[in-house]
């Protein structure tokens, strides 16, 4: 039997259930509650209250998301785009990426080492490695520096 989200208490409970599993951004949480049948008139006050209580925190969500994606080997460009697609303000994304303590160049080298382990021998290999690293979200400048054998340390 589906849970009906037609009261403030039901909406709050559903939101807290989602937040208990992992951090969510306000836009993402609102979207999930709407998908479950809650109205905007019930969602907005519930999310406002959760934010006041510190249970819904965009900065904590950003920090958690960035750390998770960085551990998975994703670069700042891909992380930035994923967060923007989730409805977060660009200024908040930039602030969070600037505050994170990830050494992106070291991470780029580690991702490259795990996948390829040797510098490209020809233009085809170089293009292949470059495409892979660009897809993972690293800048072309950093990729070029790495694939040309120059260190940016």
From Swiss-Prot:
Annotated compartments: Cytoplasm
UniProt record, GO biological process: regulation of DNA repair
A GO cellular-component term linked to this record: cytoplasm
Annotated keywords: Cytoplasm
Chief location bin: cytoplasm
Pfam families: RecX_HTH1, RecX_HTH2, RecX_HTH3
The keyword DNA damage is assigned to this record: no
Domain of life: Bacteria
HAMAP family: RecX
Role: Modulates RecA activity.
Family named by the database record: Belongs to the RecX family.
Name of the featured protein: Regulatory protein RecX
Source taxonomy: Bacteria, Pseudomonadati, Pseudomonadota, Gammaproteobacteria, Pseudomonadales
């Amino acid at each position: 039997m589906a849970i009906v989200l037609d009261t403030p208490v039901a909406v709050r409970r559903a939101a807290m259930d989602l937040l208990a599993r992992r951090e969510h951004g306000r836009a993402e949480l609102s979207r999930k509650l709407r998908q479950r049948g809650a109205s905007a008139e019930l969602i907005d006050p519930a999310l406002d209250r959760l934010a006041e209580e510190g249970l819904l925190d965009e900065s904590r969500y950003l920090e958690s998301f960035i750390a998770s994606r960085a551990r998975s080997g994703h670069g700042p460009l891909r992380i930035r785009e994923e967060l923007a697609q989730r409805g977060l303000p660009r200024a908040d994304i930039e602030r969070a990426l600037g505050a994170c303590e990830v050494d992106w160049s070291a991470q780029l080298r580690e991702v490259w080492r795990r996948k390829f382990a040797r510098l490209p021998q020809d233009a085809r290999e170089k293009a292949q490695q470059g495409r892979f690293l660009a897809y993972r979200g690293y800048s072309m400048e950093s990729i070029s520096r790495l694939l040309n054998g120059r260190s940016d340390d």
